[in-house]
Structures are given as C-alpha cells and as structure tokens.
C-alpha cells in the first residue's frame, strides 16, 4: 500500500512495514504539519485502500485555509494594581483561548501564553489562569510563537493602559 501518510493503518490495520509514505517536501509555516495534516492523510489512506492505488492529495489554498487551524485567538480579562509611579504591584488575569473542536496542541499553547504573560516585566503578586475553550470552530493549532505572542500582548496592553491612566508615555 503506497500512500503519502502513515494514517492508512487506521482503515485496514496494515502493519506499518507495509505502508510506504512519500512526502516530496514539507515547507511553509511552523505548526500546520504537526497534527493538521491528519484530515488529508485519512482521506488519502481511505482512497488508497478503496482503489488499491497510490493517492495524491493536493488541496487548493482556499480549502486548505478553511479546513486547517490557525493561531489560537485569546480573550483576556485582567485586573492590575499599580503605584502612582506606574510600578505594577499585582496582576490577576484569565486567559481564554478558542481551541476549536479538538484539543490538538492547545494545552501546551495556553501554558506558554501564561509563561510569557509577564514579558520582560516583574509582577510581585500574580494570579494567571488559562481556560482552553472547546468551540464549534476549526481546531486551532501550533503557530509560530506557540502561545507566546498572546501572553506578551497581555503584558504590553497592561503597560499601555497604565501609561494612559497616568498620562505618561509607555516608554516612561
């Protein structure tokens, strides 16, 4: 059985040594090749078993973009306590991530968002909670930054709001 994916094992329980996987190239952005190729792999495997021939799947870019996940959108609610000089004293935040219909890599991604939520700043008192949410959307996945940018945006937003409140420049 020749296919472009080891997923062919799922249909006929072929031993792995009977499955030939051929991949011409794996270029492009980080993340989509970790788990998001499963949909295409299963289709190729089923078609290969059904026809007894090798199968090539090449979705056009529009279909690929519709069917595969993107960066996790986050909704972040937070409270921050700070001194008159702008020094942050406490941060309490809930980071909710739209994970889509499956967990995929959402756990590590939401964890990494937490780890980067202070960016380069120091919070002497902090409570950060991540909430991965299952929704009816396409499952989101690993993307360049792997949750880090979402966490850093929290820190930068806090700095912006403190500066605005104190009528100062964010660089002060």
Regions found by a protein language model. Name each.
Residues 17-25, 52-62, 89-94, 123, ...:
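Beta-strand segments within the central parallel beta-sheet cores of soluble alpha/beta enzyme folds
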Residues 9-21, 163-169:
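Phosphate/pyrophosphate-binding loops at sites that engage ATP/ADP/AMP, CoA/4′-phosphopantetheine
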Residues 73-158:
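Glycine-rich loop/linker segments at domain edges
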Residues 1-7, 11:
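Single conserved hydrophobic/aromatic residue that forms the stacking wall/gate
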